[in-house]
Regions:
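General secondary-structure edge motif
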Residues: 2, 33-40, 93, 132
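Positively charged, low-complexity intrinsically disordered leader regions
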Residues: 11-51, 55
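N-terminal active-site beta-alpha-beta segment that forms phosphate/nucleotide-binding
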Residues: 61-196
């Protein structure tokens, strides 16, 4: 299948590595897979500012708790890069929180990003700190999903050693597109497939 190939320790689409969200150093913007266009089109959307992030979350271009949290984290970074003013940042943070008021990951990611803002630092330094923190949130999510995959693989192996056929049922938005890479409940399935 064109969307699920983990042979290279990542999700591939047409043999090209993709994550659901990433920071592009060249264009200095955040990029996402626009999930409203799937499965018929693969559209990469650039998030250049706070408004772009708000639209991406509200219009469900990004879906799944971990991905929404990461997008919100990048939203704090992009808002600071754009605004730099303390009062305007407080308003921007509230706008981000209002995009999905029940999304727990969104709130903890925003609070984590806000905890890194120290207005006694130079603006460029704060920007760098916020970008590093948003990227760190993404890396931590990928690491969590990989660990879920590794641990889940052991469970699948143990069960499949006892039976010939194994059916796995997942629910909710637990796949690759809900996280940065791998997925939560689906990560063990990907690991099992690649490790026969």
């Amino acid at each position: 299948h064109r969307y699920y190939n983990l042979k290279h320790n990542c999700m591939l689409i047409d043999n090209k590595k993709f994550e659901t969200i990433w920071y592009d150093d060249k264009s200095e913007c955040v990029q996402i897979i626009d999930q409203t266009k799937l499965p018929f089109e693969l559209i990469i959307t650039k998030l250049n500012n706070l408004d772009d992030v708000i639209i991406a979350i509200k219009e469900m271009k990004v879906r799944g708790a971990p991905l929404i949290g990461a997008t919100a984290a990048f939203g704090v970074y992009l808002a600071f890069r754009e605004l730099k003013d303390k009062d305007q940042m407080l308003l921007a943070i509230e706008k981000i929180k209002q995009t999905r008021p029940t999304a727990v990951n969104l709130f903890w990611a925003v609070e984590r990003m806000v905890s890194k803002i120290d207005f006694s630092y130079a603006n460029k330094e704060i920007e760098n700190i916020l970008l590093k923190e948003a990227l760190k949130i993404c890396e931590e999510d990928k690491d969590c999903c990989k660990k879920i995959g590794e641990n889940g693989l052991e469970i699948i192996k143990n069960i499949s050693n006892e039976k010939k056929k194994l059916n796995i049922l997942t629910h909710c938005n637990a796949g690759w597109l809900a996280t940065i890479d791998w997925g939560t409940a689906t990560a063990p399935i990907y690991y099992a497939r690649d490790n026969n």
